[in-house]
Every structure is written in structure tokens, then in C-alpha cells.
Design a protein with these regions (language model features):
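Short beta-strand/loop motif that positions the catalytic acidic residue
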Residues: 138-141
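Functionally engaged cysteine thiol sites
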Residues: 1-2, 172
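Functionally constrained cores in energy, signaling, and assembly domains
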Residues: 85, 135, 148
Length: 172
């Protein structure tokens, strides 16, 4: 229920950091039309188990699910690029942290992307939750979902409070 923008930013961050830590940091995971197969992603992750654990902890994803989530995010982002002609978000201003001694190296060397202005505006206009509720909404979630972190729902709760419609919103 958070803006799709924030979920896709998380996906972009995950892909560029994966590319830096496990692949060749060449942008292929985003820049090429061909998909990197999930088995190949898993093989690259399996070669660096300590990094995989750090990566999984940072993104709140179990190590066993990393390849699947990275593959899925790659698919979604490449589809968005093909539909809208570019990324609706970028990482030019992103400062990465949470990787300990690697933070400086990641920030210095990770591949950076500019947002496409048309795609960015399209997402703002069409995929941003308003928080304006006129009927009851029940958000059901678990404490672990590899694609949608619990914080996703916390965002929407705040937006409904701002719009004075939180009495229509409940989480479980």
C-alpha cells in the first residue's frame, strides 16, 4: 500500500547492489533486454555466502529466497522500462548503508541511474496512494513477505491519518 515508487526503489537498490556484490557491476541486470536466469543469479549468490547473509539481512529476505526475489525484481523493472521508456526512479542521490565496511565501496562504485521524467511523472500521477478512504479497508499481512515488507503497510496507515480517513483502515 506504499507508493509503488518506494517498492520499486527498493527493487532498484536491490538489483544494483546485487550487481556490485555478486555480479560484474556492469549493469547488465538492468540495461540489457535479456534476462539473467534465476539459476545463474543463485549460483553467483551461492559463491559468496557471507555476503548473501549480509544482503539478505539488509533487505529482510531469507537467503533461500534471494535469487527468486532478484529475478522477480529484474523482470518487473525491465517491464516498466519497456512500457514507460525508462525508470520512474533513480539512485543518483541514494546513499547506501547497512553493509558495514562495504558501504563506502558500494557508494563509490555502484552503477547509478537517472529517472526518466515521463516515467517518473506517470508513476506519481497513477501509482501514488492518496490515503482517502470512503469504505473500510482491511490490510492482511504476515511478518515476512519477501516482496512487501511490513513497513509498506505502516506508510499507508500514516497517509490515512493525514487524510482523516484512518477510521476506515485496519491492519492484521
Amino acid at each position: 500500500l506504499a507508493p509503488v515508487y518506494s517498492l520499486m526503489r527498493r527493487a532498484l537498490d536491490m538489483l544494483v547492489i546485487y550487481d556490485y556484490l555478486f555480479a560484474k557491476n556492469n549493469g547488465r541486470i538492468l540495461d540489457e533486454k535479456a534476462f539473467i536466469e534465476q539459476d545463474r543469479i543463485k549460483a553467483q549468490i551461492d559463491k559468496k555466502q557471507k555476503l548473501a547473509t549480509l544482503f539478505g539481512t539488509h533487505f529482510m529476505i531469507k537467503v533461500d529466497h534471494l535469487a527468486e526475489v532478484i529475478s522477480f525484481n529484474q523482470f518487473v523493472i525491465k517491464e516498466i522500462i519497456s512500457w514507460l521508456g525508462g525508470l520512474p526512479y533513480g539512485n543518483i542521490q541514494t546513499i547506501y548503508s547497512g553493509f558495514g565496511d562495504l558501504d563506502e565501496h558500494i557508494n563509490k562504485n555502484v552503477k547509478r541511474y537517472e529517472p526518466n521524467s515521463f516515467a517518473e511523472e506517470y508513476y506519481i500521477q497513477n501509482y501514488s496512494p492518496t490515503g482517502e478512504l470512503y469504505d473500510p479497508v482491511l490490510a492482511l499481512h504476515t511478518t515476512y513477505d519477501q516482496l512487501l515488507p511490513v513497513s509498506n503497510y505502516e506508510y499507508y496507515e500514516q497517509v490515512t491519518k493525514i487524510k482523516y480517513s484512518s477510521h476506515y483502515y485496519a491492519q492484521q
